[in-house]
Structures are given as structure tokens and as C-alpha cells.
């Protein structure tokens, strides 16, 4: 074919943002600005915010005392009511948990020279009873002073499930940290007689069905309780203080 281009067809080169315009379905910057400036559609199916319940150990700042063998506490304690920390329906779902605590040796342990592991568990109870179960009712705690060996007892494994576990290590050097030392002191240096423990757990997915009652104790739960279990190792006595935040929703019928 005669002519300057001999039948070849040439297309104009795309600009700097050509691919971006094509992905957005526009042809120019002007069309993009019009698209951005369009009023947004209202979102009518936005999910409600999570409710928050906070527990303090304790308000007098002394903390809770744990001895060898440990103790169990209900952590899904949601009484019936209209406040944010209350259940509004007969069923709740606990999604998240924030832990900001301190763990310290009891004063009776300062004279010892040793290390003490402290263990924590979040335990789901499918069929709770009238009171909190003891750790020995959940775990095979043959070695009471070595909680790291504990496991859910075989004949109750259909009822209890360990959701989360964590631990920390405390130390004692034989010196009372509350006592002032003089210039002639050349004893052992400081050690971890207390620690901060911070945790945040997601995707717990604990569904709790409640009885028709106003309180939030374990006896008010039909199905699905969540406990916090703490047990010190090495025969230690410890104190645990701080705050726990539970993030949950009220679902089901009122």
C-alpha cells in the first residue's frame, strides 16, 4: 500500500496513569475527580461494636494470692443489664481478651534462693456447674508443684478445652527487696521478684448460653464458661494484680 505509513496503524501512547484509569473504569483525570466527588452511599448493615467488660485484681491494688495447686476464676462474668459490661440477651460470644497484669512473689518467699515458673490457662467449660471447678478437677495435677506437666484429665476432656496458655518466670535471691541496704552491702544484685505480663488474645469464639437470671456467676450459665486458671510452680506463693478486658457481643433473644 502506498503512503507514508504503508497501512500500519499506530495508537497514541498511554499517559503516566493510563493503567490506573483503565483499572478504575475512567478515561481521564477529570472523570476520576468526578467519581471521587460523588456522594457515598450510606452503610446500613454496619456491624455493632463489641461490648467491653473490665475486671481489676484488685481495687485495693494488693492483687490476688495464688498458692501451690492454683485457683480458678470465671472470666466471662457478664450480669444482665443495660450497661456496656452487661449481657443484653440470653447468649453472648466472647471474641477477644486483653491482659495487663503484674505477677509478684509473696513476701514469704523472699528468703528463698530459687526460680519459680508461674503458669496461666484460659479454659473453656462446656457444662459448668454451680461453682468454679478447682484446677485439680480440670487437670491431672499429680505433680502439684510442677504445673508445666499438667494436662486436662482424660475423663473430662470432652468438657474442658484449653484455649490459651502462657507463663512467666520469677526469681528470689534471698534478699527482701523492700528493705533498704547500706553502703556496706555487697550481697546479690536485684532479680525478677516481680514482672509485668501483657497479652492480647483474638478469635476466642466462646459462646455462652445464660439462664434467666440477673447475675453473671458460673451458676447462671447453661453452657459455655471461660475460666482463668493460675498456678505457681516450685511451691511458691505469688500475687497477681492488674486488669483484664473482655470483648464480647450479646446475641440471640432478649
From Swiss-Prot:
Motif (Bipartite nuclear localization signal): 9-35
GO cellular component, one term: host cell
Keyword DNA-binding in annotation: yes
Coiled coil segments of this chain: none
Entry's localization field: Virion; Host nucleus
Keyword list, A-Z: Capsid protein, DNA-binding, Host nucleus, T=1 icosahedral capsid protein, Viral penetration into host nucleus, Virion, Virus entry into host cell
Main location as per UniProt: virion
Keyword check for Repressor: no
GO molecular function: DNA binding; structural molecule activity
Source organism, top-level taxon: Viruses
InterPro entries named among the record's database cross-references: Gemcoat_MSV, GV_A/BR1_coat, Viral_coat
GO biological process: symbiont entry into host cell; viral penetration into host nucleus
Family: Belongs to the geminiviridae capsid protein family.
Biological function: Encapsidates the viral genome into characteristic twinned ('geminate') particles. Binds the genomic viral ssDNA and shuttles it into and out of the cell nucleus. Plays a role in protection of the genome from degradation, virus acquisition and transmission by insect vectors, infectivity, and systemic movement. The CP of monopartite geminiviruses is absolutely essential for virus movement.
Stated name of the protein: Capsid protein
Taxonomic source organism: Tobacco yellow dwarf virus (strain Australia) (TYDV)
